[in-house]
């Protein structure tokens, strides 16, 4: 059984009806994965990549836990000026990659396109926009 896919299906079921519940499930899933990778690290993955994975997950979790102190950026945006104002900066591409890890990107992309976002837009950005529009 693919537990990640099953968990993603549960998130999709809640997303349109109870977005706050879907957000909680995403945060819980990220916390569980962060703990799993700390307790049972993949020894074949270079240590720097393992550390980067934790930093990315913690960055996304901080943004999801405290949206009032967060700003979404992209991989090309200089974030230092926003950090000077105490904002937690998170790359939308980073968040989108985690949504793909939950296997819910198809749902979010379809939602964004149904809201009028062009099908030619980058799928990572449609993934992000779908998540934002859903709440």
Predicted regions and their residues:
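An N-terminal assembly and electron-transfer interface module characteristic of large anaerobic redox
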Residues: 1-135
